[in-house]
């Protein structure tokens, strides 16, 4: 950690979480001068412990993969998801085709510090304990940031000017909330999370290839879901996510029934009662012991209307947040970080205009967000067992970019109509929910063998009628094919080099090569 914040910088990054550390590292490895300001002194606590397999190739690109492997974080072979108490759980298998494809469950204080220290080793000038007080803009261009004022706990203050800004300030989202005022909240994902840590739990599917996978379960009263995530430090993260209104209702009921209890006692009682509404999770808890204290946060899903502008980029939670479900947070942080770095490098190197670079970043972050949003909305549709109208929470332009190849499958024809309809979106949600279709590992593998090339994850999408004709009365094959097809829209994002290096957005794709990182015009 460096001490004296300089008075000027070429590229300045606000925030040392995954998005900020990653963007800064990528840019520093390209030879650019980068300083990073982080308000906390690491390590610091953070929630969001479950990762996707996609994080591994992201870290490989910055030579950090081995550090992740060697740290000792808990292996995540897949994820078990029980959305319906009358059906067996679904399972997303990460390692069936490649044992090295396992993800990790991480203690975020350790993972985030690992990334920040790696950034420093790669040449980023890191300053911790530095709070950004105010961002200043060009007089002749009121949305182009040119400097900021910072402060420390010892009352020292200063100003640093810069040419480029990456705002990875987390949910505070300095640029988005204070200056651009372009944050939009999703009405259908206004939730509250309450969680804590347990010791002495059992594990999911011991003695199988699924052993110790995290468990996610819908509550039987349809008010939310619960998570069970084993960690390498001997604890298990156990939390409940509730619809905000249901959370308020339950607390109000407990307060009226238990007037002699404190707010913290009522919160603990509500938490324990909600865990009882997840019978599969209760079995995994067994005789475990609750440790420490409960924590809570408002899990309000939101996005910015734009993630880039003249000489600035938004990345990670500073721009958008979906929901803890599907563990998309770190993936979207790294996606935003890489896109921010790639488009800044492209603009500096003259690969495109700054306006074109901004357009690429806006679309890249927007489509990645929308892909996961649709899966999450599909899951919540099942959890709540109702035809919730969600059209107003999905930007039509981003829907087109995210699922342009999916619309003909949903509609059952080659020509998509002009507009996005509520019926089409509901069909998409149903389709995406098959990511977690319940299958047994042995029969699933047997079905895969019977399907042959149809089971290729990189093959073309198949519509429902085609799947029905191909599988007939073979229900296991039908479920397997539904699941494979539902994962295809997300599958391409799991390999960041392929996704960034081949997906054409607004006539450009990313040149994923260290030293010449940028955009290539098609």
Curated annotation (Swiss-Prot):
The gene is armH1. The keyword Transmembrane does not apply. This is Flavin-dependent halogenase armH1. GO terms for biological process: secondary metabolite biosynthetic process. PANTHER family: FAD-BINDING DOMAIN-CONTAINING PROTEIN, FAD-BINDING PROTEIN. FAD binds at residues 16, 19, 49, 330. Gene3D superfamilies: FAD/NAD(P)-binding domain. Armillaria species are both devastating forest pathogens and some of the largest and oldest terrestrial organisms on Earth. They forage for hosts and achieve immense colony sizes via rhizomorphs, root-like multicellular structures of clonal dispersal. Flavin-dependent halogenase involved in the biosynthesis of melleolides, a range of antifungal and phytotoxic polyketide derivatives composed of an orsellinic acid (OA) moiety esterified to various sesquiterpene alcohols. The halogenase catalyzes the transfer of a single chlorine atom to the melleolide backbone, resulting in a 6'-chloromelleolide product. The enzyme acts on free substrate and does not depend on carrier-protein-dependent acceptor molecules. One of its GO terms (molecular function) is monooxygenase activity. It catalyses: melleolide F + FADH2 + chloride + O2 = 6'-chloromelleolide F + FAD + 2 H2O + H(+). Its EC number is 1.14.19.-. It holds the Pfam family Trp_halogenase. Melleolide sesquiterpene aryl esters are cytotoxic secondary products with anti-cancer potential. Armillaridin shows therapeutic and radiosensitizing effects on human esophageal cancer cells. Armillaridin induces autophagy-associated cell death in human chronic myelogenous leukemia as well as of hepatocellular carcinoma cells. Armillaridin can also inhibit the differentiation and activation of human macrophages and thus might have potential to be developed as a biological response modifier for inflammatory diseases. Chloride binds at residues 328-329. The lineage of its organism: Eukaryota, Fungi, Dikarya, Basidiomycota, Agaricomycotina. The keyword Oxidoreductase applies.
């Amino acid at each position: 950690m460096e001490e004296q914040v300089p008075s000027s910088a070429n590229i300045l990054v606000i925030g040392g979480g995954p998005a900020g550390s990653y963007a800064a590292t990528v840019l520093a490895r390209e030879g650019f001068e980068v300083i990073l300001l982080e308000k906390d002194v690491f390590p610091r606590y953070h929630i969001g412990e479950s990762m996707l397999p996609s994080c591994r190739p992201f870290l490989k690109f910055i030579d950090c993969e081995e550090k992740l492997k060697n740290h000792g974080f808990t292996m995540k072979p897949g994820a078990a998801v029980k959305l319906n108490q009358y059906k067996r759980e679904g399972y997303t298998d990460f390692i069936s085709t490649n044992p090295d494809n396992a993800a990790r469950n991480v203690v975020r204080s350790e993972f985030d510090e690992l990334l920040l220290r790696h950034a420093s080793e790669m040449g980023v000038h890191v300053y911790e304990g530095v709070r950004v007080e105010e961002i200043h803009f060009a007089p002749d261009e009121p949305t182009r940031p040119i400097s900021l004022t910072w402060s420390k706990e010892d009352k020292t203050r200063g100003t640093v000017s810069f040419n480029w800004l990456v705002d990875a300030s987390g949910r505070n989202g300095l640029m988005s909330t204070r200056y651009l005022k372009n944050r939009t909240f999703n009405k259908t994902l206004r939730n509250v999370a309450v969680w804590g840590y347990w010791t002495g739990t059992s594990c999911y599917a011991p003695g199988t290839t699924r052993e110790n996978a995290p468990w996610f379960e819908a509550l039987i009263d349809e008010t939310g879901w619960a998570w069970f995530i084993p960690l390498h430090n001997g604890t298990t993260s156990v939390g409940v996510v509730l619809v905000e209104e249901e959370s308020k209702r339950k607390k109000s009921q407990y307060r009226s029934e238990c007037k002699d209890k404190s707010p913290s006692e009522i919160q603990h009682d509500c938490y324990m009662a909600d865990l009882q509404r997840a019978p599969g999770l209760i079995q995994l808890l067994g005789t475990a012991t609750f440790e420490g204290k409960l924590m809570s946060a408002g899990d309000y899903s939101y996005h910015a209307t734009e993630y880039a502008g003249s000489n600035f980029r938004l990345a990670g939670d500073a721009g958008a947040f979906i929901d803890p479900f599907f563990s998309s947070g770190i993936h979207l942080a790294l996606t935003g970080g890489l896109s921010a770095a790639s488009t800044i490098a492209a603009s500096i190197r003259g690969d495109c205009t700054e306006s074109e670079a901004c357009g690429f970043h806006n679309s890249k972050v927007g489509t990645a967000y929308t892909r996961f949003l649709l899966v999450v909305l599909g899951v919540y549709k099942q959890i709540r067992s109702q035809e919730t109208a969600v059209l107003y929470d999905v930007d039509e332009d981003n829907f087109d970019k995210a699922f342009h190849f999916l619309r003909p499958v949903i509609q059952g024809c080659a020509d998509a109509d002009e507009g996005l309809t509520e019926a089409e979106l509901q069909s998409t949600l149903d389709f995406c929910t098959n990511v977690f279709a319940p299958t047994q590992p042995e029969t699933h593998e047997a079905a895969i063998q019977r399907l042959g090339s149809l089971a290729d994850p990189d093959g073309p999408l198949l519509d429902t009628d085609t799947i029905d004709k191909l599988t007939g009365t073979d229900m296991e094959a039908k479920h397997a094919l539904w699941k494979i097809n539902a994962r295809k829209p997300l599958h391409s994002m799991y390999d960041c080099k392929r996704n960034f290096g081949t997906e054409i957005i607004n006539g450009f794709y990313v040149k994923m090569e260290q030293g010449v990182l940028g955009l290539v015009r098609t």
